[in-house]
């Protein structure tokens, strides 16, 4: 603390006075996250050195998932918890980091679901879910029920937007895109929204766009522009109105495009294990490139049939990739998937 780093703010052409940073990380500093990578890597090494064993997914062992200071451990059994605690404490002692014990929670899976678990962890109750990076994780997770609650929360907030009254489409669209669709987009990367729920979201958005009184859910409204025309690009006379169904499918389809890129990642290895091996364990000669080859309906069905029952989201990603014909039109995927 005697030599605390100092910062000052540059705003409106002027500098503020210098001030000390005595805790935390300097926000907005491009070097800060890079430096923190060195600290986070130390935890990964400590876990490895302690011999902590993770969960096997085929031949792939998953032990730890890290994103900045958010860490999730996938332990093979409750016996691994002691080793993990030793590694964690050694890392804290070496780096000066400190775990927020109040936020520690655990999810018992498999044969451990109904057994007695060690103390010191807030274990998720049966029927509930844990949260990792904002995403719910649970046994027999009811994603439809989770989405229903999320849509209800967003709808209640949107029904208070009295400032929409009197605004035109483009003014309303800025708010609908950022404050309505924007409150749900993040989870499209990891959770399947059911078809009927997709229609609910689209119906709500249409009301917010076109109704004279957007807060009145019972009031009927009439479109001044045909739906098909409104969804076209503005350069061609459209309004760029969001097609939420295409949007959700594009989010899933782009995972296959990312999967085929050369960058290495643990999740790609897990997909390899599930998708690129036949019943005899033989690997596809084309590798990931098979997803951009002309495949027959039978071949597509065969690949999708390899996806384990617990990986429904992956199966939906493949389905959307195939039905949107990404092999022929990657530009369409990029346009739909990135619209905001």
Locations of the language-model features?
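Conserved pre-catalytic core of RNA-dependent polymerases
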Residues: 1-42
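Active-site-adjacent bridging/hinge elements
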Residues: 3-20, 150-158, 214-227
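Short, conserved micro-motifs composed of acidic
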Residues: 2, 13-15, 84, 98-129
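Extended C-terminal regions of large enzymes
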Residues: 197, 201, 217-340
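Catalytic palm subdomain of template-directed nucleic-acid polymerases
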Residues: 24, 64-94, 110-111, 141-143
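Mobile genetic element proteins and their domesticated derivatives, centered on retroelements
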Residues: 9, 28, 32, 40-43, ...
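Basic, alpha-helical interaction scaffolds
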Residues: 120-196, 251-266
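Active-site palm subdomain of RNA-directed nucleic acid polymerases
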Residues: 35-68, 72-74
